């Protein structure tokens, strides 16, 4: 149970006062004893009184001192030990070898302390210096030191090259049932060099593990065995050592259920810490500071410095917080650096919600975090999931190297220590929520390349793809090649061996050398490097950032080798990291930084230093598959932009060439420019062909087809000559002239946007027919059309024959009756339309039976159709019938202004299919359609109310009108007729049903329904009279039976027959 204990600073004051008072008391007692032995007896009461006076004199000082208490986890280690120390001081004040200082009593001095942070000198007595007289306790601005260090920080081996073994890429892990979270977390942890090196170093514990469980061994042993399996197996393995201990890791995790990878990571690290603490006998009595010195905490653990500043009195309260991962909010960030800026920025606390220690009241304050001690391996979790399970799927861009120096605390030791980290592994989540999806991992190998681990699948991945990954958990390890051997809060990152740091300079070695940013070859060319090592040692490398001349040391894997211990290389920031920080593209490398992965099998590749590999990447940027694909896409886009200079709308589809045998000459000007030029040369004609026989005989080329054809060959055809009609050249170079073809070409300017939509289907349909009809056409005309026939095209060709609609679209005007024909290339329903298309687009001058008859048919040949296809006039397209005002209009080749204007109208005879710029129906059009649908439904439901609102109206007699269908819902005359036949048969045949019963039924029916269906028409309405007449007719048996006599007449007839 937690107990309260006096703070060290106050306890020191109390101990000093007690020593001083007891020292005076002992001195007086010694004087009294000397009196007794030398000069006779004395009064014992006088000596006791003297001691009481002396104690009471110092009691005021003790009582006036301020005593502060803090919460401690254990009573025995805190209170009883302090009491024992006090008793020892009373009995043996001069000869005491035990320490009288409490935990952390020597925080403020600059002397070298022991392993537990105590000052063991001066026989345990603490002498106050002049500088410590005002500050006798520990400084609140410094991180407290633990009594005992379980695992020194210096023993952590950073980097793959610090291990004596050769690290492999690692095999995949088989998914044994929703264990992708477990596999990805283990792969990410096993590719952290510091953790992997520590697990390998636990071989002694693995052999002598005294923890006997049902599954055998502790969780650390299970992790070490799994790591060895991934390095030794040749195929995917099953992580059964970890999977079998899932309940031991976390009790609420269920086997076979999907779990969160970050939650599993936290429980796994905590289980490993507990397993390590169980090696010590009194692990339950260790304080929190000591427990934070385990290997897991030394690798992942760090300390945050929290500064809370009062806005009233500017008092600053400093606290320290231990962390193993940073949870970054990415809702307002797009990059990892922005997320770090938001995490370490100063935030304002709730107004009047903080109680200031200086003001002793609740005030407004600000809070800011900073890094007091940075971890060796930085774990970053991006907050992608909410409490309700939703996922934030935004992409956060990050770099393979980050610098956190600007977030370090403002102490001199921390400010001078550069904090450069490099990405070693990450966990990604694919899915839209935390309840579903898939986890994968990415890890960096010893060669410096990255691999993607998707359960049992392992494949290399380029650096560019790694940086574009939608990451969830990221692991960055401290980069020793970018750091200098400086102490961090008394703990050195190196092994105690000092070395001289070599500063980096940007200035060149010679006055004539200019600064060059980007890839640059070394002085010796490519031969100056051998497996990533520089051959020149005396001269500085001429790179973007050059280094001064330095003394050569035997190097292994980028770290200097001392007396059996690994040291950091004296390199400063590499050019690669500097270039990347400036925004330059990071070169994507393969397994060993080379294009071919076969070089990874060389014997000297494991001796490459990380810094030198970065130099090699900086000098020779290697292209990856992703970069090649991007280059190819860029080249394609450039070629397309060069070949197609014509600007197009976003809704215009991209056209492809109809056939491979068309000319490949580029188009020098756009189709629109050619059409404008042709319009200037063409005389104006009548807009509406009311009574012109000559214009009716002349075929008018379809402007939409001409536009679609010219668009489809935009990238492959040459400029049309003035004599060309449709802007196309023949297959063999022959040209076709049509002088009257541009009669209605001015309509294209009004329909340039809408006509482009039909070009895609037109070109696709022409592609299908080219191969089938090419041979047939070559037999007929061999690709040539004589000039005489082209002239006869405008004289003797019959007008197109549209299909017979159910109701012809006829418009009455003052000038007479005329039909409305439309140009619509997107209307085609079945295969019969193809035959009508052939009839409409004839090229051979065959006279039709009746040119004035719109329903006349003419024969056609496949060769004629092929010739029309070559000329670009007849292009088959998918057609959809458009219905306007109850009439169904079909496509025709006569293009005129009226048809184009009708198609563009929102109401009237045209369709309402107006598309937006994106090619989709407009929102306003959707609302109008929905409103019209609701209105029709409302009219259908409230037909009687609407008829009442309209009042009496004139009824139109129609021979085909069936009043009983709409006026009597639920009434079936055929059923009534059959019922009447059954009643008549039963009465005439002497059945069990008498006739009068049927008659009464009919009378009752008529009486009940007399006014039910005649509410608004009045008694003399035509509808009511028809209903009554129909009812009487059916009641009498229809047309086959006459009116039946009444019941009295039947009785009279029966009497007469009997008599």
Curated annotation (Swiss-Prot):
Pfam families: UCH. The lineage of its organism: Eukaryota, Metazoa, Ecdysozoa, Arthropoda, Hexapoda. Its main location: nucleus. GO terms for biological process: germ-line stem cell population maintenance; negative regulation of macroautophagy; protein deubiquitination; proteolysis; regulation of apoptotic process; somatic stem cell population maintenance. It is found in: Nucleus, Nucleolus. Required for maintaining multiple types of adult stem cells, including male and female germline, epithelial follicle cell and intestinal stem cells. May function as a transcriptional repressor by continually deubiquiting histone H2B at the promoters of genes critical for cellular differentiation, thereby preventing histone H3 'Lys-4' trimethylation (H3K4). Controls selective autophagy activation by ubiquitinated proteins. Signal peptide: none annotated. The gene is Usp36. Residues 766-776, 825-839 have a biased composition (Acidic residues). Gene3D superfamilies: Cysteine proteinases. The modification Phosphoserine is found at residues 508, 510, 692, 694, 766, 801, 807. Belongs to the peptidase C19 family. The active site is at residues 180, 438. This is Ubiquitin carboxyl-terminal hydrolase 36. One of its GO terms (cellular component) is cytosol.
């Amino acid at each position: 149970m937690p107990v309260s204990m006096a703070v060290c600073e106050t306890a020191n004051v109390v101990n000093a006062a007690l020593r001083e008072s007891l020292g005076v008391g002992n001195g007086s007692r010694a004087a009294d004893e000397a009196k007794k032995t030398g000069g006779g007896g004395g009064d014992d009461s006088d000596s006791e009184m003297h001691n009481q006076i002396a104690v009471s004199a110092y009691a005021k000082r003790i009582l006036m001192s301020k005593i502060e208490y803090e919460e401690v986890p254990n009573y025995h280690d805190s209170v009883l030990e302090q009491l024992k120390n006090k008793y020892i001081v009373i009995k043996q004040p001069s000869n005491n070898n035990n320490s009288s200082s409490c935990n952390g009593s020597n925080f403020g001095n600059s002397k070298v302390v022991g392993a537990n942070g105590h000052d063991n000198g001066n026989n345990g007595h603490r002498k106050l210096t002049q500088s410590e007289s005002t500050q006798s306790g520990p400084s609140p601005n410094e991180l407290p030191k633990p009594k005992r260090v379980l695992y020194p920080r210096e023993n952590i081996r950073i980097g793959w090259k610090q291990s004596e073994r050769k690290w492999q890429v690692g095999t995949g892990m088989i998914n044994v049932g929703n264990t992708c979270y477990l596999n990805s977390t283990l792969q990410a942890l096993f590719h952290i060099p510091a953790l992997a090196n520590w697990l390998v170093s636990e071989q002694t514990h693995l052999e002598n593990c005294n923890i006997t469980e049902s599954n055998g061994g502790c969780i650390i042993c299970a992790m070490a065995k799994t790591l060895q399996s991934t390095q030794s197996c040749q195929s995917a393995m099953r992580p059964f050592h970890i999977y079998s201990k899932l309940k031991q890791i976390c009790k609420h995790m269920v086997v076979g259920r999907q779990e969160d990878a970050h939650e599993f990571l936290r429980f796994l690290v905590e289980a490993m810490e507990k397993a390590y603490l169980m090696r010590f006998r009194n692990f339950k009595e260790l304080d929190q500071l000591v427990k934070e010195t385990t290997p897991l905490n030394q690798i992942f653990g760090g300390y945050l410095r929290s500064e809370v500043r009062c806005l009233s009195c500017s008092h600053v309260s400093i606290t320290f917080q231990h962390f193993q991962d940073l949870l970054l909010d990415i809702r307002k960030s797009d990059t990892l650096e922005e997320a770090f800026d938001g995490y370490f920025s100063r935030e304002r606390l709730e107004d009047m919600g903080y109680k200031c220690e200086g003001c002793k009241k609740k005030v407004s304050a600000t809070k800011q975090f900073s890094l007091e001690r940075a971890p060796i391996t930085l774990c970053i979790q991006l907050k992608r999931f909410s409490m309700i399970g939703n996922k934030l799927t935004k992409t956060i861009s990050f770099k393979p190297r980050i610098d956190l120096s600007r977030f370090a605390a403002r102490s001199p030791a921390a400010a001078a220590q550069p904090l450069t980290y490099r990405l070693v592994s990450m966990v990604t989540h694919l899915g839209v929520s935390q309840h579903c999806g898939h986890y994968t991992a990415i890890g960096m190998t010893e060669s410096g390349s990255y691999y993607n681990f998707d359960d049992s699948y392992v494949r290399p991945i380029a650096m560019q793809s790694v940086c574009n990954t939608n990451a969830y958990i990221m692991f960055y390890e401290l980069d020793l090649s970018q750091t200098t051997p400086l102490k961090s809060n008394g703990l050195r990152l190196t092994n105690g061996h000092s070395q001289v740091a070599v500063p980096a300079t940007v200035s060149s070695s010679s006055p004539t050398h200019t600064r060059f940013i980007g890839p640059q070859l070394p002085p010796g060319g490519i031969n100056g490097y051998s497996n990533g090592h520089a051959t020149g040692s005396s001269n500085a490398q001429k790179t973007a950032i050059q280094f001064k001349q330095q003394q050569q040391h035997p190097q292994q894997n980028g770290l200097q080798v001392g007396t059996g211990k690994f040291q950091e290389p004296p390199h400063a920031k590499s050019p690669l990291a500097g270039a990347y920080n400036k925004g330059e593209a990071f070169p994507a490398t393969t397994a060993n930084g080379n294009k071919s992965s076969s070089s990874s099998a060389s014997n000297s590749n494991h001796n490459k230093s990380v810094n030198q590999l970065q130099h090699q990447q900086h000098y020779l940027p290697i292209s990856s598959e992703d970069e090649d694909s991007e280059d190819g896409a860029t080249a394609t886009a450039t070629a397309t932009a060069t070949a197609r200079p014509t600007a197009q709308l976003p809704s215009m589809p991209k056209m492809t060439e109809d056939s491979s045998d068309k000319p490949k000459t580029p188009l020098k000007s756009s189709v629109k420019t050619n059409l404008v030029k042709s319009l200037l040369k063409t005389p104006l004609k009548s807009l509406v062909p009311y009574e012109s026989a000559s214009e009716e005989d002349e075929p008018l080329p379809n402007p939409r087809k001409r536009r679609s054809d010219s668009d489809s060959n935009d990238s492959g055809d040459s400029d049309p000559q003035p004599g060309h009609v449709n802007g196309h050249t023949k297959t063999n170079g022959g040209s076709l002239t049509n002088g009257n073809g541009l009669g209605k070409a001015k309509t294209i300017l009004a329909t340039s946007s809408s006509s482009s939509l039909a070009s895609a289907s037109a070109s696709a349909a022409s592609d299908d027919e080219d191969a089938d009809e090419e041979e047939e056409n070559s037999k007929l005309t061999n690709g040539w059309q004589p000039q005489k026939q082209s002239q006869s095209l405008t004289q003797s060709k019959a007008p197109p024959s549209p299909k017979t609609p159910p109701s012809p679209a006829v418009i009455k005007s003052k000038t007479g009756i005329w039909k409305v024909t439309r140009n619509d290339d997107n209307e085609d329903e079945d295969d019969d339309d193809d035959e009508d298309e052939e009839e409409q687009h004839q090229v051979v001058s065959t006279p039709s039976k009746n040119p004035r008859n719109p329903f006349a048919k003419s024969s056609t040949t496949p060769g004629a159709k092929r010739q029309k296809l070559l000329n670009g006039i007849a292009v088959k397209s998918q057609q959809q019938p458009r219905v306007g005002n109850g009439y169904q209009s079909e496509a025709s080749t006569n293009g005129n202004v009226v048809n184009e204007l009708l198609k563009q109208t929102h109401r009237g005879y045209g369709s309402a299919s107006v598309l937006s710029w994106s090619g989709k129906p407009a929102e306003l059009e959707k609302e109008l359609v929905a409103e019209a649908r609701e209105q029709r439904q409302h009219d259908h439901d409230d037909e009687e109310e609407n008829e009442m609102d309209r009042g009496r109206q004139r009824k139109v007699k129609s021979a085909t009108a069936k009043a009983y269908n709409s006026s009597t819902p639920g009434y079936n005359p055929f059923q009534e007729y059959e019922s009447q036949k059954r009643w008549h048969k039963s009465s005439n045949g002497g059945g069990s049903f008498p006739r009068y019963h049927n008659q009464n039924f009919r009378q009752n029916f008529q009486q009940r329904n007399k006014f039910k269906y005649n509410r608004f028409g009045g008694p003399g309405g035509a509808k009511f009279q028809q209903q009554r007449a129909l009812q009487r007719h059916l009641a009498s048996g229809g047309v086959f039976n006459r009116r039946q006599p009444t019941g009295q007449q039947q009785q009279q007839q029966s009497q007469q027959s009997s008599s």
